[in-house]
């Protein structure tokens, strides 16, 4: 398929560190987080309206829907996994939350970053060191798996900036990004046990001319990955079986943070970007950094996002 048929449209205002898009097929709405501004935001693509819930608890790294519950979300805020009571229909300044469990309990300088729910309703989320003067201490993070017992289990440690994750539709492969490595790795996946094994590098940016580091990612029904490049101005499309770069799509922001498919047929790729800590020059050249963009005409379809299964 040729590049020129792809349209890239801005669908929200520019926010701060927009990240972690999660498509809710039930409501046809897109949730995402604005990490440092401490908001969960919800876009209604039909109207363009964005509603926001302020999370006083701390920076919000990730948000997912909860199974069979229209007005509850689960998010990672600071080092806590929290239950958020919000139906998304209006702005909320005093959002009600409940702490479900905590991770990195032996550390105090880390926070939850990206995460996703697997086919059995378990929440996988990872941590990273807090940014200090633009720097993140290496090897302070961990990737965890949390089921309905709310007891975090360690899957990968140490990592530096735990980021994108995806499972293939056959549910026997798990893909993962620790951003500073500039690699996407694949594992064999056991969906019953929720365990991973046999790590293998499936794409290495260090062996390409691509700029930036891999950040968030998603997978399509063909089993190919879509990866956001933070500092790289692009979303890349990668075949994890061959390690081949299939194509790249330029985004009007340098720091592209994450991607997910949405829309009734899961054919629109929603792309989050960051407007956080930009120089005056960057703001001038990319005034819409921090916005969400919608890519259409890619000729690919996504896989439904899972919701967290809780004992309620």
Predicted regions, residues:
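A short beta-strand motif characteristic of beta-propeller blades
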Residues: 6-12, 48-54, 98-105, 150-157, ...
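Short loop/turn segments immediately following beta-strands, especially the blade-tip
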Residues: 84-92, 187-195, 240, 296-302
């Amino acid at each position: 398929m040729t590049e020129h048929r792809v349209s890239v449209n801005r669908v929200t205002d520019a926010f701060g560190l927009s990240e972690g898009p999660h498509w809710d097929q039930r409501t046809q709405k897109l949730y995402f987080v604005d990490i440092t501004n401490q908001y969960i935001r919800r876009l209604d693509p039909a109207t363009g309206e964005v509603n926001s819930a302020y999370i006083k608890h701390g920076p919000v790294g990730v948000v997912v829907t909860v199974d069979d519950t229209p007005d509850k979300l689960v998010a990672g805020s600071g080092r806590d996994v929290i239950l958020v009571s919000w139906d998304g229909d209006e702005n909320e300044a005093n959002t009600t939350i409940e702490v479900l469990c905590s991770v990195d309990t032996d550390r105090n300088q880390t926070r939850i970053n990206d995460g996703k729910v697997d086919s059995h309703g378990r929440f996988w989320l990872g941590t990273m060191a807090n940014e200090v003067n633009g720097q993140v201490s290496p090897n302070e993070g961990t990737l965890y798996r949390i089921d309905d017992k709310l007891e975090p289990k360690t899957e990968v440690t140490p990592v530096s900036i735990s980021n994108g994750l995806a499972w293939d539709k056959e549910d026997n492969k798990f893909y993962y990004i620790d951003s500073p490595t500039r690699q996407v790795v694949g594992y064999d996946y056991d969906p019953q046990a929720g365990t991973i094994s046999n790590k293998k590098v499936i794409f290495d940016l260090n062996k390409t001319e691509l700029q930036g580091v891999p950040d968030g990612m998603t997978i399509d029904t063909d089993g190919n990955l879509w990866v956001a490049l933070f500092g790289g101005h692009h979303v890349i499309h990668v075949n994890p079986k061959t390690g081949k770069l299939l194509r790249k799509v330029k985004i009007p922001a340098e720091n592209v943070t994450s991607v997910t498919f949405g829309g009734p047929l899961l054919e629109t790729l929603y792309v989050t970007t960051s407007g956080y800590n930009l120089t005056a020059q960057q703001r001038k050249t990319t005034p819409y950094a921090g916005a969400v963009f919608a890519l259409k005409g890619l000729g690919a379809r996504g896989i439904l996002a899972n919701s967290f299964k809780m004992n309620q």
